[in-house]
Design a protein with these regions (language model features):
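Short, glycine/polar-rich helix-capping loops at beta-to-alpha or helix-loop-helix junctions
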Residues: 96-101
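Conserved functional loop/turn residues at catalytic and ligand-binding sites
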Residues: 87, 95, 108
Length: 128
């Protein structure tokens, strides 16, 4: 989902509409916000343009299984890699643990917490 070349936020560039904002939310199979950010099985990466979801990609991350695997810190490193690869600018979640909050702060990534219900609605609320 990485965009080629420089992005013109919310504007057409080379006949492509680039997002105003890229957000990530943990999502259940029925489209609700999964209350577990760091242990989510699936997340959605959403491109928001002019207050509307222009693209929605759900990705199996299996963080529930991977959370306790590997050396200390490897799970946070995995999440950082995912967020950077997908150029995420805001994390939308119900709750995030203290360690993950610190990690997001070091990345200067804001977290919109307390999200419940429809994952798409939560993304739009966070983007507004």
């Amino acid at each position: 989902m990485a965009t080629p070349g420089p992005r013109s936020r919310g504007r057409r560039h080379d006949e492509r509409l680039y997002p105003d904002m890229i957000l990530c939310v943990p999502v259940t199979s029925d489209g609700q916000v999964d209350p577990r950010w760091g242990r989510a099985d699936r997340v959605a990466v959403a491109d928001v343009v002019d207050g509307e979801i222009a693209a929605w990609q759900e990705i199996e991350v299996s963080w529930s299984r991977l959370h306790d695997e590997g050396a200390p810190g490897s799970h946070h490193a995995r999440v950082v890699r995912f967020l950077r690869e997908h150029q995420v600018e805001i994390v939308v979640a119900n709750h995030i643990g203290d360690g993950m909050v610190r990690m997001l702060a070091t990345m200067s990534l804001p977290a919109h917490l307390g999200a419940v219900g429809s994952a798409r609605a939560a993304v739009l609320e966070a983007a507004s």
